[in-house]
Regions:
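Short alpha-helical
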Residues: 7, 54, 149
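Generic structural "secondary-structure junction" signal
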Residues: 7, 36, 40, 81-83, ...
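Internal alpha-helical scaffold of NAD(P)-dependent oxidoreductase catalytic cores
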Residues: 15-25, 43-130
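NAD(P)-dependent Rossmann-like dehydrogenase/reductase catalytic/cofactor-binding core
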Residues: 86, 93-94, 122-226
Length: 226
């Protein structure tokens, strides 16, 4: 259930792999699992990342009396980075909602965020397509649209130009990725927009307009070269 990056920029899976005995099994549980809803008896959904089916069955039995539906994934790197990065991208939805950019923009952000997320997951050693499942798309939509979402609210604050209280997994992830240069942020324009807004929260609307213009130009250039 542990997620995020530690102060050395490592995922929980990397820490487990480096510190547990070679034959010690471990599992990672990620997906749309809002705790208040689980306590209220509502269903939640998750991917359980582990290397063997026996571990999956053991963990599934542990949650037998909880309305938590699990699927199995062997792509531990992929689900790890999907759930880590979704908190970053969720802030973009909060910014867009605060700026009243509209439902069309929200739909656009879902597509672009998943495209970038898939590319990053591949770069970080995961499998193509993993972000389109529960740990990625499922958790992103939940985090990006829930009225109780901390990261959606962070995005709203950034759009208002507020700089205090901008804390959480998303801002910490941005800091670690930048500090340790885990990947080239400039290769992912929406991710770069979010990073820029966290660093300098003035004129977030202008950042979106610049992003849309660049996206349009890139799309036009791509269509002519195909």
């Amino acid at each position: 259930i542990a997620k995020g990056l530690d102060e050395s920029g490592k995922t929980a899976a990397q820490i487990f792999a480096e510190n547990l005995p070679a034959q010690q099994p471990y599992a990672l549980l990620y997906g749309p699992m809002i705790s208040e809803e689980i306590r209220a008896g509502r269903h939640a959904f998750a991917q359980l990342g582990c290397h063997d089916l026996r571990s999956f069955e053991t963990m599934r039995d542990c949650f037998r009396d909880v309305p938590l539906l699990m699927t199995h994934s062997c792509d531990i790197a992929g689900i790890s980075w999907s759930v880590i990065l979704k908190n970053v991208y969720a802030m973009a939805f909060g910014m867009a909602d605060e700026l009243k950019l509209g439902d069309n923009v929200r739909g656009f952000l879902v597509v672009v965020a998943l495209q970038e997320l898939n590319r990053i997951v591949i770069e970080m050693g995961g499998h193509s397509g993993t972000p389109y499942h529960l740990a990625g798309l499922g958790d992103l939509i939940t985090t990006a649209t829930s009225i109780s979402s901390h990261h959606h609210e962070l995005g709203r604050k950034l759009a208002r130009g507020e700089t205090t209280g901008i804390t959480g997994e998303g801002p910490h992830t941005l800091k670690m990725i930048h500090q340790y240069q885990l990947f080239e942020i400039q290769q992912y324009p929406l991710f770069q927009l979010i990073h820029s807004a966290v660093q300098h929260s003035e004129n977030v609307r202008g950042k979106f307009e610049d992003y849309f213009e660049q996206f349009f130009q890139d799309s036009q250039n791509a269509s002519f070269t195909q």
